Amino acid sequence: MGFKFEKLDVWKQSLDYSDAAYDIAELLPKKERYNLSDQLRRAATSVSLNIAEGSTGQTDKEQNRFLGISLRSLIEAVACIHLIRKRNYCDTEDEKKQLKSLYKEANHLAARIQAMRNSLAGSVDEPEIDYFAED
């Protein structure tokens, strides 16, 4: 693996999440192909793409910004999960189990992304300079 992001466990987990989201998207009715199904796929894919983009050649502050975008994309995917559940698009026991698993995985991934953001936040904090202080 030649890129920094390829070594990140959180990125690897986000790929698994995206894969599972694609599986759910395939279960949705044809009428949702270009709406909810597409939205779920794009949101889930955006999680790993932003982790990757932010990790390569960026400052900690910039990487933190991309992780924030990644986290918001994950939340968007979770909102899609709620819509899928509310519309009863996953109605068999196996499909319900897959949807519940995707939700749990989102919780775990969100915690990992936030932990990474917190670790970066500590490295970008700089002391405030008081330019008007007397020497």
Residue ranges and their predicted role:
Residues M1-E53, G57-D135:
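Short, C-terminally biased terminal segments at protein or domain edges
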